[in-house]
Amino acid sequence: MKKFRWVVLGIVVVVCLLLWAQVFNIMCNQDVQFFSGICAINKFIPW
């Protein structure tokens, strides 16, 4: 049962990361000033 909980936790983390990547892409496309520096770094991370 403990292993199942770790699997669920792992899936939740992956989904959160994917959603975060989507938010980043939207913000970068909007060219929000605050995100411009983060977007530069984000381009080097292969999502």
Swiss-Prot record:
Keyword Protein transport applies: no
Topology of this chain in the membrane: Single-pass membrane protein
GO cellular component terms attached to this protein's record: plasma membrane
This protein's UniProt keywords: Cell inner membrane, Cell membrane, Membrane, Transmembrane, Transmembrane helix
GO BP term (any one): negative regulation of phosphorelay signal transduction system
Location (main, coarse): membrane
Superkingdom to which the source organism belongs: Bacteria
Spans through the membrane: 6-26
Alphabetized InterPro entries for the sequence: MgrB (IPR020907)
Assembly description: May form homooligomers. Probably interacts with the periplasmic domain of PhoQ.
Protein name from the UniProt record: PhoP/PhoQ regulator MgrB
